[in-house]
Amino acid sequence: MNEEKHWNRIAPTYNAEIFDVFQSDKRKVLTKYFKKHTNIKHEAIDFGCGNGKAFSYLAPRFKKVLGVDISEKLLRQAKALLHKNIILKQGDLTQSLRLPKVDFIFCCNVAILPEVQTNIAIIKNIQKTLKVGGHALVVIPSLESMIYSAWRLIDWYKKENVKPEKIDTSEYAGLSGKKIDILQGLVSIDGVTTKHYTQQEIEVVFTRCELTVLKIEKIEYNWNSEFTKPPKWMKEPYPWDWLVECVRL
């Protein structure tokens, strides 16, 4: 898939189509970590900034922010937000880019492409762009959460006296792909193959990319992020994405 064309096509309906991590973060975990890394003397990059949803969090907390994205149309939307200390650059984060060394990088649901090695390239670019001692926050989908949500769906049907084998396969279409794909965390979301990660995989992959993982934490969402009309009895544990806090040593 041509990523640039894909995101330029989605740009007009981006806010409606793309899940908003910031608005959906139940416990405001992202805000906590942004506060932790705030330093108005530091410079930051938003890796895959889209139309600038993170800018209101980053702009007040850093001296300068560079927003990088593959989509020219999304960058036009981001430019309209008019943050004085933010500049924008079009670029493919899977390729070698000439980016300034910075103290902080934020990367939200970008290293999620169906080609596993391409995601490794993105994470390596994060490492290359950080100064020694610089930190990154990386948000990526959880494979454990995807499997857990499927189990919750089966449990829901059981309460309505429907056996697992009687559930329409469309209900868990994301996990109906090839076994080898699912084992690699490649799951279909609305027809788009998306890379999901286990916690242990994160530790291995980031270490191989020469990033030291400091913390892996859940960003939890309400059940309506998974199901159209979840029952009221369905409470915590909630579905989640992973937030990876890491440092270049």
What function would you assign to each model-found segment?
Residues M1-N39, K41-G48, Y57, L137-D168:
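Conserved class I S-adenosyl-L-methionine
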Residues N51-Q95:
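Class I SAM-dependent methyltransferase SAM/SAH-binding core
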Residues F106:
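A conserved beta-strand element that flanks and buttresses the S-adenosyl-L-methionine
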Residues P114, G185-E201:
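Acceptor-substrate binding/catalytic loop of class I
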Residues I120-V132:
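A short glycine-rich, Lys/Arg-flanked "PGG" loop and its adjoining helix->strand segment in the class I
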Residues K229-L249:
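Core SAM-dependent methyltransferase catalytic element
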